[in-house]
Each structure stands twice: as C-alpha cells, then as structure tokens.
C-alpha cells in the first residue's frame, strides 16, 4: 500500500505543478483500482485522474475502469463547480441582508489549486456571528436550503 500512496502523492505533485505523470509501466489493474480508491477517499480523484490519464502506464488500466473513472472525475468536477457557483450567488444575498459571513476552508482552500473545482469538498463552511444566525437561516431557507437536523433554537444549536 505504501507504493500506491507514494504514486498518489507523485501524481498529486504533478497536478499541483501543472504537469502530467510520465509513468511507463509497473502498475497492475489492481494497483490502478487501489490508487483511485485512495484518491477518492481523499477527495482528490479528479486531480489524480487529470495527472495520470495520458501517461503510458495508464494504457494498461482496464478500459471499464478508465471509463468509470473518467465519468466519476467529470461528474465530481461538474458538481463542485455547481456548488461553488451556488455559494458565490448566496454570499452576496447574505451581505445584502446585513450579515458578515466569512468563508473558511472549502472555496478558500480550493482557490489555491490550479483547477479549483478538481478539489472536491463535501460542504462549504461559513463562519457567522451568533447574533446573525436567524438572518442567515432566513436567507438560506429563502434560497431553497434546509438544515439537515432542524433545531428549535438556532442559538443553542450553534449552526444554521
């Protein structure tokens, strides 16, 4: 497994540097599966796929796996792009209502990558002063959002 981890880190380094891997051989079908499973667990599958898809060694990967991975990578990038767009539309609405949200992690960290939407994230974290919870909650609901676990008291819940 250490070899697969090292390959993943090498591919990630290539992606971050705007290059592709140049692996000639040495990866079995099982290795490719393990590499992309690990990449998926770390939410970097699109980045790793982007870095390796054109290397000679990738031609040894099973065609079905390649097609599945290509589909997953494209889907993940598209979904992340949509999430980013939704945040960028929601943020000014919060500000218009007098809120002072601060985006932390998520979009801020993704902006450090060459292709931001290749770094997927499960959600966006927005720091909101407690006294603005009700305003933000209202804006979220008006824009089609709902809390996963509705709380009777937003202040007590500590999140909206």
Tell where the protein language model's regions lie, with residue ranges.
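Helical scaffold of the NTase/Pol beta-like nucleotidyltransferase catalytic core
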Residues: 2-9, 16-105
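Conserved short internal alpha-helix adjacent to the catalytic or cofactor-binding core
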Residues: 11, 18, 158-160
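Residue-level "edge-of-site" marker
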Residues: 52, 107, 152-154
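Active-site nucleotide-donor binding segment shared across nucleotidyl transfer reactions
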Residues: 86-141, 149
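Catalytic core of pol beta-like nucleotidyltransferases
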Residues: 130, 148-160
């Amino acid at each position: 497994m250490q070899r697969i981890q090292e390959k993943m880190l090498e591919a990630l380094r290539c992606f971050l540097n705007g290059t592709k891997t140049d692996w000639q051989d040495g990866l079995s079908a099982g290795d490719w599966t393990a590499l992309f499973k690990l990449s998926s667990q770390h939410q970097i599958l699109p980045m790793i796929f982007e870095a390796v898809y054109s290397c000679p060694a990738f031609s040894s990967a099973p065609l079905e796996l390649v097609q599945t991975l290509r589909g997953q990578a494209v889907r993940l990038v598209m979904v992340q792009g949509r999430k980013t767009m939704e945040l960028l539309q929601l943020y000014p609405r919060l500000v218009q209502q007098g809120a002072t949200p601060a985006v932390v992690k998520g979009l801020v960290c993704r902006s450090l990558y060459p292709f931001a939407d290749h770094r997927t994230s499960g959600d966006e974290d927005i720091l909101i002063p407690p006294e603005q919870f009700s305003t933000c909650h209202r804006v979220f609901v008006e824009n089609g959002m709902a809390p996963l676990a509705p709380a009777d008291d937003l202040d007590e819940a500590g999140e909206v």
